[in-house]
């Protein structure tokens, strides 16, 4: 039996701003549903990923921006960096380590992401 990771909740302070940010960097919008006056559920998925992020109103008691250590894997770190730059997000220079090449960025609330290319994997 497989146990696949489906969803990671991100605490954000402004749902529309987060939705716009993640759309701008290429995430696909899966759902944006207002359940009630207290609950709004937005689900977005990075291109090619089986796991999504969700944020909204009434979904998390965590402090906005408190999620650290989120990571996505890409097949071309330079292309990913250029895509982020084109979206107005500065991921810094590529950090080349023996176990992978990385760029990093924060969403508008400070939730921290790593983008990794693993050169030892076949693409």
Cite the ranges covered by each PLM segment.
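Short, solvent-exposed beta-strand edge segments and adjacent coil->beta transition regions
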Residues: 3-7, 65-69
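Core segments of cupin and vicinal oxygen chelate
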Residues: 2-3, 9-51
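Short, charged/polar surface micro-motifs in flexible loops or helix N-caps
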Residues: 47-51, 61-62, 76-79
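Vicinal oxygen chelate
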Residues: 7, 32-33, 40-43, 81-123
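Mid-chain, well-packed structural core segment of small domains
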Residues: 69-82
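Short, charged/polar, Gly/Pro-enriched secondary-structure boundary elements
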Residues: 49-53, 110-113
